[in-house]
Amino acid sequence: MDKNTDDNKKYDKKRNISDEEIILKIKEEVKKIQPELIEKIRELVSIYSIQTEPEENAPFGKGPAEALDKALEISEKLGFNTVNIDNKIGYAEYVSEEIRDYEEYIGIFGHVDVVPLGEGWKYPPLGGKIENNRIYGRGVLDNKGPILSNLFALHILKKLGIKFDVPVRIVFGANEETGFACVKHYLTKKKAPIFGWTPDCKWPVVYGERGRLKVRIYSEMKDLQKLYEFVNGYILSAPNNGVKLKINFKDDDFGEMILRGYRFGIAENRHFFEFVMSYPAICKKDQLMDLIRSNLTEGTELEEISNWNPVLYDKSSEYVQTLQKVYNYATGFNSEPVTTTGGTYAKIIPNIIAYGPSFPGQKDIAHLPDEWLDLSDLEKITEIYALSLYEISKLKNRK
């Protein structure tokens, strides 16, 4: 990735970050709060917050509820007002006095639940051990560290007296890894934000997420050969862009259709072949289902297993361009907004995008043994989020 030109390095002047004194103070505060931020990440990581059987006041199990309580406790100690919505999701809120009753808001959505520990750890998975300038533990990257980084970034702006024309919420979900039920519940109680992000993906700005449609093609035992012939002819021996199925859609934002996740299996005494379509926004789920059905042979049938529609935010919008310029300014890169095959809270929460925390080249960290977050990266992402919030504060967010 190319570094910024000299002109882009003057982003603070070009993008009207005119108050260099405030920028300097923000960067100084980011450095100052790192020890406390690291300690709070370690506290949150020590809670094993995988989903288990529901208990009283713990709809996703004891761990997620305890982690949510801890995140809200940390927020309160930083001086934020907090709200716990039925122990499923909660938030910390920063509101200027003059807009206390204003309903629209900027929302930053992260999560405090984690995937199971798994085997093969060198470091204690709930220990938050620091070694080689890295903190290790389940959830340090996905997503306890990044959402607390955003909380502390907002705390810095609050401390410096930076005002927003709408409230800003840091939202802590407790069911991201196992179904997004937390944010679905949130939307039954609260309005969607006018803009925001989820720090649960990668840099730079992610303005779009591919759709993800999982299907199965079934056959009875007597038609098993027909299933094998269809799958081999139309999928396994064909390019993985779906051209043989006539679903090889592509667009400028996402590129071409991708077929993946191939699996044979048996369910309810029927054989099936399962696969996933990672599809661009130019096509729709029903269109894909109809086209696949039109190719099926007698004795086979198609069933939808799950679907997440694509997300596509206007990359030319003031919000996206502001965040991208902040990222380039803070990192020295000269990158452009991108799309992803992944899926985040942006699939559910309207008007938000994915924004950080993994830098280019950082892969295969979350969900694996010895999940880690580099402490230098932690400081940098906190700086990016703080500067991003500062820039958002200068926009006209009120509708």
What kind of region is each of these model predictions?
Residues 7-135, 164:
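Acidic/His- and Gly-rich active-site-bordering loop/insert found
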Residues 225-254, 301-399:
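An extended, acidic, His-containing surface patch that forms the Zn2+-binding/catalytic region
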Residues 176-290:
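Midchain, well-structured core segments that form catalytic/ion-binding scaffolds
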Residues 71, 147-157, 186, 349, ...:
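Buried hydrophobic packing segments
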Residues 81-86, 261-264, 303, 338:
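Short beta-strand
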Residues 102-167, 172, 368-371, 375-380:
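Active-site metal-coordination/substrate-binding segment of hydrolases
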Residues 112-114, 171-179, 200-203, 359:
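Acidic, glycine-rich active-site loops and adjacent beta-strand->loop/helix elements
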